[in-house]
């Protein structure tokens, strides 16, 4: 699928792929970050590697991953002023008889508490079911991350269970809560499902 065709608008956000002309906004979003607020937040970090050449490579890599149906990464732009406030993705877990994807969303810390995460998750569900043809979407969340758990619940996800020792983080295997949402009958795109 052509990555540039995946665009969603929510009341506050535009979710779309990065374009070459977005470099300054992309960089400004990360420059605006304050110190990390919790263990899930990268906060401020060295931005020296975020050169224009690096950025061009990022855009090319994201397009290749979309064409190969590996992942679809979109940036979050605030509609009122075009500020880059985060990014999100839908990653293919398995196609065929499963049509199973995973979503993720990162809102940069200056923009927390404004409902952007919930809007993003809802938009990803719509994209995942309608444009990408997934039947099942899931999200993986640390047990001690109640903010992300609330976002997913507000977006219609249901807590399905816990995967033990699921993700290797900071030198240890961590358990993750699994939240899922299933496409309503007929919601999956027939074209995306190969029908």
Mark where each language-model region is.
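Conserved GNAT-fold acetyl-CoA-binding loop/helix
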Residues: 36-60
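Acyl-donor (CoA/ACP) binding surface of acyl/acetyltransferases
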Residues: 1-39, 73-195
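A short helix-loop-beta-strand connector motif used in the catalytic cores of GNAT acetyltransferases and
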Residues: 46-47, 59-75
């Amino acid at each position: 699928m052509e990555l540039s065709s995946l665009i969603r608008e929510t009341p506050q956000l535009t979710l779309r792929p990065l374009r070459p002309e977005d470099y300054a906004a992309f960089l400004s979003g990360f420059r605006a970050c304050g110190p990390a607020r919790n263990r899930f937040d990268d906060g401020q970090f060295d931005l020296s590697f975020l050169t224009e050449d690096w950025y061009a490579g990022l855009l090319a890599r994201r397009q290749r991953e979309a064409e190969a149906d590996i992942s679809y990464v979109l940036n979050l732009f605030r509609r009122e002023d075009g500020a880059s406030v985060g990014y999100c993705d839908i990653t293919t877990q398995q196609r065929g008889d499963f049509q199973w994807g995973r979503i993720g969303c990162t809102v940069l810390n200056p923009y927390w508490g404004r409902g952007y995460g919930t809007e993003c998750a809802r938009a990803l569900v719509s994209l995942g079911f309608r444009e990408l043809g997934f039947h099942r979407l899931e999200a993986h969340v640390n047990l001690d991350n109640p903010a992300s758990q609330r976002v997913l619940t507000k977006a219609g996800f249901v807590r399905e269970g816990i995967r033990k020792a699921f993700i290797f983080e900071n030198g240890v295997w961590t358990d993750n809560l699994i939240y899922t949402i299933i496409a309503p009958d007929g919601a999956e795109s027939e074209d995306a499902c190969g029908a």
